[in-house]
A protein has these predicted regions:
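Protein maturation boundaries and topogenic segments
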Residues: 1-68, 131-150
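Acidic/glycine-rich C-terminal interaction modules and beta/coil loop segments
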Residues: 3, 36, 40-47, 81-150
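Short, positively charged
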Residues: 32-33, 74, 80
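Structural motif
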Residues: 58-60, 73-76
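Short catalytic-loop micro-motif centered on adjacent basic/acidic residues
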Residues: 62, 79-80
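Short, charged beta-turn/beta-strand-edge "cap" motif at the junction between a beta-strand
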Residues: 66-71, 84-87
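Short amphipathic alpha-helical leader/targeting segments
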Residues: 72-73, 119
Length: 150
């Protein structure tokens, strides 16, 4: 009987330790990334197929801050605030103008409306020239968005 109590106590303690570790990672990792990448939103989930094949729906991407238009180049994948519907959009830069830039999703046929430089939140972190992403890590966000928009 005493042995069984010890096993139960050990199980409960291990459970709480794991919860604390997972909670620390869940809360701490985004804060650490926000600080190190100089951006309030260091991660984003791809919620549509507009950036296929570079980014797939459900991918989690890492975003780094930009200081201004001098940090942006044609071909960069950026995150910008879409003021029409108060959402964020992740598309590739196709033109750089004096006061605004133009983007387009890789899978889209037409360009987006011009984006003011002050609406650019950041650009995707790249590794060996490719966007840093975790495939399917954002599937919960995609699922929740689809359920909310039904």
């Amino acid at each position: 009987m005493e042995q069984k109590k010890k096993k139960i106590i050990k199980f409960v303690l291990n459970f709480f330790v794991y919860i604390l570790i997972i909670g620390g990672i869940t809360v701490g990792l985004p804060k650490l990334l926000a600080w190190s990448l100089n951006i309030p939103y260091p991660m984003a989930t791809i919620t549509s197929g507009s950036m296929w094949p570079a980014l797939k729906e459900g991918d989690l991407v890492f975003i780094k801050g930009v200081q201004g238009k001098n940090d942006l180049n044609i071909g960069d994948i950026i995150v910008y605030r879409n003021n029409l519907n108060n959402t964020f959009t992740i598309h590739r830069v196709v033109e750089l103008g004096e006061d605004a830039l133009t983007t387009r999703g890789d899978a889209n046929f037409s360009k987006d409306a011009p984006v003011r430089y002050e609406d650019v939140v950041g650009k995707t972190l790249t590794v060996f020239g490719r966007p840093a992403r975790v495939p399917n890590a954002g599937f919960i966000t995609v699922y929740a968005n689809k359920k909310l928009n039904q």
